[in-house]
Protein backbone atom coordinates (compact mmCIF):
# COMPACT_ATOMS: atom_id res chain seq x y z
CA UNK A 1 0.00 0.00 0.00
CA UNK A 2 2.67 2.50 1.06
CA UNK A 3 4.89 1.50 -1.87
CA UNK A 4 2.08 2.12 -4.36
CA UNK A 5 1.03 5.36 -2.66
CA UNK A 6 4.57 6.73 -2.86
CA UNK A 7 5.04 5.52 -6.44
CA UNK A 8 8.07 3.38 -5.58
CA UNK A 9 9.22 0.69 -8.04
CA UNK A 10 8.22 -2.90 -7.37
CA UNK A 11 10.41 -4.44 -4.66
CA UNK A 12 12.81 -7.24 -5.63
CA UNK A 13 15.41 -7.53 -2.85
CA UNK A 14 15.21 -8.93 0.67
CA UNK A 15 16.40 -5.79 2.45
CA UNK A 16 14.11 -3.44 0.52
CA UNK A 17 11.21 -3.74 2.95
CA UNK A 18 13.22 -1.98 5.67
CA UNK A 19 14.10 0.85 3.32
CA UNK A 20 10.52 1.22 2.12
CA UNK A 21 9.35 1.26 5.74
CA UNK A 22 11.80 4.06 6.54
CA UNK A 23 10.73 6.03 3.47
CA UNK A 24 7.10 5.58 4.49
CA UNK A 25 7.65 6.88 8.03
CA UNK A 26 9.64 9.83 6.71
CA UNK A 27 6.76 10.78 4.43
CA UNK A 28 4.24 10.40 7.27
CA UNK A 29 6.38 12.71 9.40
CA UNK A 30 6.70 15.20 6.54
CA UNK A 31 2.93 15.12 6.03
CA UNK A 32 2.36 15.86 9.73
CA UNK A 33 4.84 18.74 9.57
CA UNK A 34 3.26 20.08 6.37
CA UNK A 35 -0.25 20.03 7.81
CA UNK A 36 0.89 21.35 11.19
CA UNK A 37 3.04 24.21 9.96
CA UNK A 38 0.64 24.99 7.11
CA UNK A 39 -2.27 25.19 9.54
CA UNK A 40 -0.25 27.35 11.91
CA UNK A 41 0.66 29.69 9.05
CA UNK A 42 -2.99 30.09 8.04
CA UNK A 43 -3.92 30.64 11.69
CA UNK A 44 -1.37 33.43 12.09
CA UNK A 45 -2.57 35.12 8.89
CA UNK A 46 -6.10 35.21 10.28
CA UNK A 47 -5.29 35.76 13.95
CA UNK A 48 -2.90 38.62 13.37
CA UNK A 49 -4.50 40.27 10.34
CA UNK A 50 -4.16 44.04 10.05
CA UNK A 51 -7.86 44.76 10.58
CA UNK A 52 -7.66 43.14 14.01
CA UNK A 53 -4.24 44.45 14.95
CA UNK A 54 -3.75 47.84 13.28
CA UNK A 55 -0.82 48.61 15.58
CA UNK A 56 2.28 46.42 15.54
CA UNK A 57 3.09 44.39 18.66
CA UNK A 58 6.78 44.63 19.52
CA UNK A 59 6.62 42.36 22.56
CA UNK A 60 6.96 39.11 20.61
CA UNK A 61 6.01 35.59 21.60
CA UNK A 62 5.79 34.96 25.32
CA UNK A 63 4.58 31.35 25.19
CA UNK A 64 6.96 28.35 25.23
CA UNK A 65 4.81 26.35 22.81
CA UNK A 66 7.02 27.04 19.80
CA UNK A 67 10.12 25.98 21.71
CA UNK A 68 8.56 22.68 22.73
CA UNK A 69 7.30 21.99 19.22
CA UNK A 70 10.78 22.55 17.79
CA UNK A 71 12.24 20.20 20.41
CA UNK A 72 9.65 17.56 19.49
CA UNK A 73 10.56 17.84 15.81
CA UNK A 74 14.26 17.44 16.62
CA UNK A 75 13.55 14.37 18.78
CA UNK A 76 11.49 12.70 16.06
CA UNK A 77 14.20 13.38 13.49
CA UNK A 78 16.79 11.87 15.84
CA UNK A 79 14.61 8.77 16.30
CA UNK A 80 14.30 8.36 12.53
CA UNK A 81 18.06 8.69 12.14
CA UNK A 82 19.23 6.59 15.09
CA UNK A 83 16.38 4.10 15.22
CA UNK A 84 15.88 3.45 11.51
CA UNK A 85 18.43 4.95 9.11
CA UNK A 86 21.67 4.03 10.91
CA UNK A 87 20.70 0.36 11.59
CA UNK A 88 19.62 -0.12 7.97
CA UNK A 89 22.86 1.43 6.70
CA UNK A 90 24.91 -0.68 9.13
CA UNK A 91 23.23 -3.82 7.81
CA UNK A 92 24.26 -2.89 4.28
CA UNK A 93 27.85 -1.97 5.17
CA UNK A 94 28.96 -3.94 8.23
CA UNK A 95 27.07 -7.20 7.80
CA UNK A 96 28.27 -8.25 4.37
CA UNK A 97 28.48 -12.07 4.27
CA UNK A 98 31.77 -13.87 3.58
CA UNK A 99 32.63 -13.98 -0.11
CA UNK A 100 32.60 -17.78 0.10
CA UNK A 101 28.84 -17.63 0.74
CA UNK A 102 28.04 -15.13 -2.01
CA UNK A 103 28.38 -14.56 -5.72
CA UNK A 104 31.06 -11.91 -6.16
CA UNK A 105 30.88 -9.81 -9.32
CA UNK A 106 33.13 -6.96 -10.38
CA UNK A 107 31.36 -4.04 -12.03
CA UNK A 108 33.61 -1.36 -13.50
CA UNK A 109 31.97 1.84 -14.66
CA UNK A 110 33.35 3.96 -17.47
CA UNK A 111 32.09 6.62 -19.83
CA UNK A 112 29.54 5.35 -20.79
CA UNK A 113 29.18 1.66 -20.03
CA UNK A 114 29.11 -0.97 -17.29
CA UNK A 115 31.84 -3.64 -17.56
CA UNK A 116 30.87 -6.80 -15.69
CA UNK A 117 33.27 -9.61 -14.73
CA UNK A 118 32.70 -12.99 -13.07
CA UNK A 119 35.53 -15.03 -11.56
CA UNK A 120 34.39 -18.26 -13.21
CA UNK A 121 34.43 -21.78 -11.69
CA UNK A 122 37.79 -21.27 -9.93
CA UNK A 123 36.36 -18.37 -7.92
CA UNK A 124 39.48 -16.27 -8.52
CA UNK A 125 39.61 -13.08 -10.55
CA UNK A 126 42.45 -13.06 -13.04
CA UNK A 127 45.16 -10.45 -13.40
CA UNK A 128 44.51 -7.16 -15.19
CA UNK A 129 47.07 -4.87 -16.80
CA UNK A 130 46.34 -1.28 -17.78
CA UNK A 131 48.72 -1.58 -20.73
CA UNK A 132 46.42 -4.23 -22.21
CA UNK A 133 43.29 -2.09 -22.11
CA UNK A 134 41.56 -1.82 -25.47
CA UNK A 135 38.36 0.21 -25.62
CA UNK A 136 36.67 -2.28 -27.94
CA UNK A 137 38.26 -5.70 -27.39
CA UNK A 138 39.49 -5.58 -23.78
CA UNK A 139 38.07 -2.64 -21.79
CA UNK A 140 39.22 -4.13 -18.47
CA UNK A 141 42.76 -4.97 -19.56
CA UNK A 142 42.24 -8.64 -18.65
CA UNK A 143 45.44 -10.67 -19.03
CA UNK A 144 44.26 -14.00 -20.44
CA UNK A 145 47.76 -15.46 -20.07
CA UNK A 146 47.14 -15.58 -16.31
CA UNK A 147 45.75 -19.04 -15.42
CA UNK A 148 43.21 -17.45 -13.07
CA UNK A 149 41.89 -15.30 -15.92
CA UNK A 150 41.22 -18.14 -18.35
CA UNK A 151 37.71 -18.75 -17.00
CA UNK A 152 36.80 -15.15 -16.19
CA UNK A 153 33.52 -14.20 -17.89
CA UNK A 154 32.99 -10.62 -19.02
CA UNK A 155 29.86 -8.90 -20.27
CA UNK A 156 29.01 -5.37 -21.31
CA UNK A 157 25.97 -3.68 -19.77
CA UNK A 158 24.53 -7.08 -18.82
CA UNK A 159 24.52 -8.39 -15.25
CA UNK A 160 23.25 -11.95 -14.73
CA UNK A 161 22.37 -12.98 -11.16
CA UNK A 162 20.84 -16.05 -9.47
CA UNK A 163 17.74 -15.46 -7.36
CA UNK A 164 17.87 -15.77 -3.54
CA UNK A 165 21.67 -15.77 -3.56
CA UNK A 166 23.73 -13.17 -1.65
CA UNK A 167 25.37 -10.88 -4.18
CA UNK A 168 28.47 -8.78 -3.59
CA UNK A 169 29.12 -6.30 -6.37
CA UNK A 170 32.65 -4.90 -6.21
CA UNK A 171 32.12 -1.50 -7.73
CA UNK A 172 34.89 0.47 -9.43
CA UNK A 173 35.29 3.30 -11.93
CA UNK A 174 37.86 3.85 -14.68
CA UNK A 175 37.51 7.56 -15.27
CA UNK A 176 35.04 9.79 -13.40
CA UNK A 177 32.49 9.31 -10.62
CA UNK A 178 29.50 7.22 -11.65
CA UNK A 179 26.61 5.88 -9.56
CA UNK A 180 25.33 2.29 -9.71
CA UNK A 181 21.59 2.19 -9.10
CA UNK A 182 18.94 -0.51 -9.48
CA UNK A 183 15.67 0.93 -8.09
CA UNK A 184 13.89 -2.42 -7.65
CA UNK A 185 16.77 -3.67 -5.48
CA UNK A 186 16.77 -0.42 -3.46
CA UNK A 187 20.47 -0.16 -4.28
CA UNK A 188 22.44 2.95 -5.15
CA UNK A 189 26.17 3.49 -4.67
CA UNK A 190 28.70 5.87 -6.20
CA UNK A 191 31.56 4.33 -8.16
CA UNK A 192 34.71 6.33 -7.44
CA UNK A 193 38.04 6.04 -9.32
CA UNK A 194 40.72 4.51 -7.13
CA UNK A 195 38.25 2.73 -4.82
CA UNK A 196 36.66 -0.71 -4.83
CA UNK A 197 33.35 -0.44 -2.99
CA UNK A 198 31.35 -3.57 -2.08
CA UNK A 199 27.58 -3.46 -2.61
CA UNK A 200 25.61 -6.25 -0.96
CA UNK A 201 22.03 -7.37 -1.68
CA UNK A 202 19.92 -10.48 -2.22
CA UNK A 203 17.55 -10.40 -5.23
CA UNK A 204 14.42 -12.41 -4.51
CA UNK A 205 12.29 -11.96 -7.64
CA UNK A 206 13.39 -13.33 -11.01
CA UNK A 207 12.99 -11.29 -14.16
CA UNK A 208 10.35 -13.74 -15.38
CA UNK A 209 8.37 -13.40 -12.14
CA UNK A 210 8.55 -9.61 -12.28
CA UNK A 211 7.23 -9.64 -15.84
CA UNK A 212 4.24 -11.61 -14.59
CA UNK A 213 3.68 -9.31 -11.61
CA UNK A 214 3.88 -6.12 -13.64
CA UNK A 215 2.00 -7.52 -16.63
CA UNK A 216 4.86 -6.26 -18.80
CA UNK A 217 6.43 -9.01 -20.94
CA UNK A 218 9.28 -6.64 -21.86
CA UNK A 219 10.22 -5.76 -18.27
CA UNK A 220 13.93 -5.59 -17.43
CA UNK A 221 15.77 -4.55 -14.30
CA UNK A 222 17.76 -1.51 -15.35
CA UNK A 223 21.11 -0.27 -14.08
CA UNK A 224 20.95 3.50 -14.20
CA UNK A 225 23.92 5.79 -13.72
CA UNK A 226 22.64 8.27 -11.14
CA UNK A 227 25.63 10.62 -11.38
CA UNK A 228 26.07 13.09 -14.23
CA UNK A 229 29.24 11.70 -15.80
CA UNK A 230 29.59 13.46 -19.15
CA UNK A 231 27.85 14.18 -22.43
CA UNK A 232 26.88 10.54 -22.93
CA UNK A 233 25.44 10.10 -19.42
CA UNK A 234 21.94 9.63 -20.82
CA UNK A 235 22.94 6.41 -22.62
CA UNK A 236 24.81 4.78 -19.73
CA UNK A 237 22.27 2.03 -19.19
CA UNK A 238 22.75 -1.56 -18.17
CA UNK A 239 20.37 -4.42 -17.50
CA UNK A 240 20.11 -7.08 -14.80
CA UNK A 241 18.69 -10.52 -15.52
CA UNK A 242 17.71 -12.40 -12.35
CA UNK A 243 17.42 -16.13 -13.01
CA UNK A 244 16.83 -19.33 -11.11
CA UNK A 245 20.00 -21.05 -9.88
CA UNK A 246 19.67 -23.63 -12.65
CA UNK A 247 19.23 -21.01 -15.37
CA UNK A 248 22.21 -19.05 -14.09
CA UNK A 249 24.41 -22.14 -14.06
CA UNK A 250 23.30 -23.00 -17.60
CA UNK A 251 24.28 -19.50 -18.71
CA UNK A 252 27.65 -19.72 -16.95
CA UNK A 253 28.36 -23.14 -18.50
CA UNK A 254 27.58 -21.75 -21.96
CA UNK A 255 29.97 -18.86 -21.36
CA UNK A 256 32.71 -21.29 -20.32
CA UNK A 257 32.20 -23.29 -23.51
CA UNK A 258 32.49 -20.07 -25.51
CA UNK A 259 35.76 -19.23 -23.76
CA UNK A 260 37.14 -22.69 -24.52
CA UNK A 261 36.26 -22.24 -28.18
CA UNK A 262 37.98 -18.88 -28.30
CA UNK A 263 41.05 -20.34 -26.61
CA UNK A 264 41.33 -23.06 -29.22
CA UNK A 265 40.88 -20.76 -32.17
CA UNK A 266 43.14 -17.86 -31.28
CA UNK A 267 46.05 -16.82 -29.13
CA UNK A 268 43.81 -15.03 -26.64
CA UNK A 269 44.99 -17.24 -23.76
CA UNK A 270 48.63 -17.52 -24.76
Positions of PLM-derived features:
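Alpha-helical transmembrane segments
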Residues: 23-36
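Central hydrophobic cores of alpha-helical transmembrane segments in multi-pass inner-membrane proteins
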Residues: 36-44
Amino acid sequence: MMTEWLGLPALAATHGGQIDNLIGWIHVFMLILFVGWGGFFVYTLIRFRKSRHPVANYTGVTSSASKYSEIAVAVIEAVLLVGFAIPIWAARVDRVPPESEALVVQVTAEQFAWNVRYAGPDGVFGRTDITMIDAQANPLGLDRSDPAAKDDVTTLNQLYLPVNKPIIVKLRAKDVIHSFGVPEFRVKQDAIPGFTIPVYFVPDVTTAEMRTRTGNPEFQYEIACAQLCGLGHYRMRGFVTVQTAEEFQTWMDAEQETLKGEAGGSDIFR
